[in-house]
Structure formats: structure tokens, C-alpha cells
């Protein structure tokens, strides 16, 4: 299993309970596909550099998880069909890095 990170930009109009329900759904997808959620880091409401869907603010959430590669495809499919998610990006995190003295 590999370690991944997904950064989500959510609509500022999503209520807190709707936002939590969405994140619960996404973490459920990861766990259903034999992955495990490490952390869900809420960065909060931030100003955007340019309008996204006519909004100048967005709510950022960073998800970190370990999962097989097929899980990422399923997670991104669910993200694409979900309302309230403006943008997202998923990256594979590096394996353990050795420090050079």
C-alpha cells in the first residue's frame, strides 16, 4: 500500500454538517477499498487568488491516507460526482526519506 494525499477545495456555502458528511463519505470510500485514513486536516476558509465558480473564498481540507492505487481512482470518481467540491488534487507521497548528514 502506498501513502497518498488529497487536497480538496470545498464550497464556502456548504454548512458544517454537510461538510462533515461529505468527508465521512470520502473516508468511508477509502476504508471500503482496503485503505486506511491517516488524517483529515481542516485548513479552514481561505481567500482565493482568482474566482472559482464565481466564489472568492473556499474551504480547504487535506486528506492523508494509505491505500492501493485502485482506491485513488474510486475516490476521485466519487469526488467528481459530489456537489460542493470545487477542485481537488491527489499526489503520491514519497516513501521514507533518508536524511543525509
From Swiss-Prot:
This is Small ribosomal subunit protein bS6. One of its GO terms (cellular component) is ribosome. The keyword Ribosomal protein applies. The keyword RNA-binding applies. Signal peptide: none annotated. Pfam families: Ribosomal_S6 (PF01250). Binds together with bS18 to 16S ribosomal RNA. One of its GO terms (molecular function) is small ribosomal subunit rRNA binding. Disulfide bonds: none annotated. Belongs to the bacterial ribosomal protein bS6 family. GO terms for biological process: translation. Keywords: Ribonucleoprotein, Ribosomal protein, RNA-binding, rRNA-binding.
Amino acid at each position: 500500500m502506498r501513502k497518498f494525499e488529497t487536497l480538496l477545495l470545498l464550497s464556502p456555502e456548504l454548512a458544517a454538517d454537510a461538510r462533515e458528511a461529505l468527508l465521512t463519505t470520502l473516508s468511508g470510500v477509502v476504508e471500503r477499498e482496503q485503505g486506511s485514513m491517516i488524517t483529515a486536516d481542516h485548513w479552514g476558509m481561505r481567500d482565493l487568488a482568482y474566482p472559482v465558480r464565481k466564489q472568492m473564498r473556499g474551504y480547504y481540507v487535506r486528506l492523508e491516507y494509505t491505500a492501493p492505487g485502485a482506491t485513488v481512482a474510486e475516490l476521485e470518481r466519487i469526488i467528481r460526482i459530489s456537489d460542493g467540491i470545487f477542485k481537488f488534487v491527489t499526489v503520491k507521497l514519497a516513501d521514507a526519506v533518508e536524511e543525509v548528514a
